[in-house]
A protein has these predicted regions:
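A sequence-level detector for short glycine-anchored, His/Arg-bearing signature motifs
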Residues: 90-106
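N-terminal extension/subdomain marker
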Residues: 1-16
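Serine/threonine-rich, low-complexity intrinsically disordered segments
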Residues: 4, 22-24
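Short hydrophobic/aromatic-enriched beta-strand-loop microsegments
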Residues: 110-116
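Amphipathic, charge-rich alpha-helical segments that serve as recognition/docking helices
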Residues: 116-122
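Short alpha-helix boundary/capping and kink motifs at helix termini
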Residues: 36-94
Length: 122
């Protein structure tokens, strides 16, 4: 799915690692969070019981939600969610959906790494 949205995003594995390492950290406001595609964070923001819904989705994805919640509470260093920002300002979550939605459900504004892309997300 991601390959169809981001065709030829990385030339090879080393290119990908380099882009991730050099990406900047940002804190998104609610409007930006809602505008990210390929994530459930908008649904979490709209949910009356944010935590319950985030846990339900994390379970559906086979994620160890207890470890993520515990890690967020204890301020364990996790890899940040990765977001691609294209030439038009469109945002696409490349990885970290469970961390992002559980963090939002807990009331945290987690930093995300933003990779700028000169092309357009499909």
């Amino acid at each position: 799915y991601t390959k169809s949205k981001l065709p030829n995003f990385w030339k090879d594995r080393d290119d990908g690692r380099s882009m991730i390492k050099t990406a900047s950290y940002e804190f998104f406001d609610e409007k930006e969070l809602r505008s990210i595609s390929n994530t459930d964070v908008g649904e979490i923001l709209d949910s009356e019981n944010k935590m319950e819904r985030a846990i339900e989705l994390a379970k559906d994805y086979g994620k160890n939600y207890k470890r993520i919640i515990d890690g967020i509470k204890k301020k364990v260093e996790f890899p940040p969610p990765l977001v691609v920002k294209d030439s038009k300002g469109k945002l696409y979550l490349l990885g970290g959906n469970s961390r992002l939605m559980l963090g939002v459900a807990m009331g945290y504004n987690l930093p995300v790494k933003v990779i700028s892309w000169s092309k357009k997300i499909q």
